[in-house]
Amino acid sequence: MAKDNRKLIVVGVDGSELSLVALRTARRLADLLHCRVEAMTVWTHPISLAAPVASAEWSPRVDAEEALNEAVLQAFGDDVPEGLTKIAVSGQPVQVLVEASKDAEMLVVGSRGRGGFAGLLLGSVSSAAAAHAHCPVLIVHPSETE
């Protein structure tokens, strides 16, 4: 399989409605700019005071990959963009997205994710990513048309 040398648009995906809008927006931009899309989700090891769960029973990485697959399915159905890659990375969302931005033409994120306060105009991850990314950042806000 030949390597895809098109420039990259990275999309932060957390399964929220705005991250689905971010995926769709990135696709439209990728089509216009002849780029490829990388859908990225970030997971962390849970902090627990209880005994660790055996990895054969539960894996946060597998959960993250399944959630990412579901988000891509919800965003595109059977019409997944050609060359779209999906990646689930362990770490802190801001750090992972900023690192990914080093190789990207653009980073696309929703204005708010699953956490935090619904009334805020801009979430902590999108705000920090915009402040520290190594490429332009597009922050997708809710609209009545989506």
Regions found by a protein language model. Give the residues of each.
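Structural beta-alpha unit
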Residues: 1-5, 18, 32, 74-107, ...
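Small/aliphatic-rich secondary-structure junction motif
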Residues: 2-53
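General small-molecule cofactor/ligand-binding pocket signal
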Residues: 38-40, 85-89, 138
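Short, hinge-like loop/turn segments at secondary-structure boundaries
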Residues: 54-58, 104-105
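A short acidic, glycine-rich active-site loop
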Residues: 56-67
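Glycine-rich, Arg-bearing micro-motifs that act as flexible, cationic patches
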Residues: 106-132, 142, 146
